[in-house]
């Protein structure tokens, strides 16, 4: 190999290393985003599980205390109240984005669902 071929080979390797470095940086950024999203989803999942457990406990204590009430009428009102509470806590209750966190204020789909009679 003469000096020019050796120099061209080194330049080619340098370009490949630069390209790999950029790809590695992009991959690192993507992994960071995925880890952050995973953490948010885990927190949201835990929060929803706690809410579900609390709702189940409330429902079981309510049925024990109010066994003489009509279950059909109270279940409809209670479900609506639970959805309204979830909406006030910042979660979507509409069929479009159900369960995801509301980020930009009120959702028209959720509000129309809450206002149905």
From Swiss-Prot:
Binds 1 zinc ion per subunit. Residues 45-81 are annotated as: Disordered. Keywords: Cytoplasm, DNA replication, DNA replication inhibitor, Metal-binding, Zinc. The keyword Transport does not apply. Its main location: cytoplasm. Zn(2+) binds at residues 92, 94, 107, 110. Disulfide bonds: none annotated. One of its GO terms (cellular component) is nucleoid. It is found in: Cytoplasm, Nucleoid. One of its GO terms (biological process) is DNA replication. Residues 46-62, 72-81 have a biased composition (Basic and acidic residues). The keyword Ribosomal protein does not apply. Its cofactor is Zn(2+). Belongs to the YabA family. NCBIfam families: PRK13169.1-5. Homotetramer. Interacts with both DnaA and DnaN, acting as a bridge between these two proteins. Involved in control of chromosome replication initiation. Inhibits the cooperative binding of DnaA to the oriC region, thus negatively regulating initiation of chromosome replication. Inhibits the ability of DnaA-ATP to form a helix on DNA; does not disassemble preformed DnaA-DNA helices. Decreases the residence time of DnaA on the chromosome at its binding sites (oriC, replication forks and promoter-binding sites). Tethers DnaA to the replication machinery via the DNA polymerase beta sliding clamp subunit (dnaN). This is Replication initiation control protein YabA. The lineage of its organism: Bacteria, Bacillati, Bacillota, Bacilli, Bacillales. The gene is yabA.
């Amino acid at each position: 190999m003469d000096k020019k071929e050796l120099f061209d080979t080194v330049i080619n390797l340098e370009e490949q290393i630069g390209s790999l470095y950029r790809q590695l940086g992009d991959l690192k950024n993507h992994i960071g985003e995925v880890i952050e999203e995973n953490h948010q989803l885990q927190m949201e999942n835990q929060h929803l599980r706690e809410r579900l457990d609390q709702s189940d406990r409330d429902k079981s204590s309510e049925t024990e205390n109010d066994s003489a009430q009509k279950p059909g009428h109270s279940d409809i009102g209670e479900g609506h109240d639970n959805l309204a509470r979830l909406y006030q806590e910042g979660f979507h209750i509409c069929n479009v984005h159900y369960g995801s966190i509301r980020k930009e204020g009120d959702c028209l789909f959720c509000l129309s669902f809450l206002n149905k009679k």
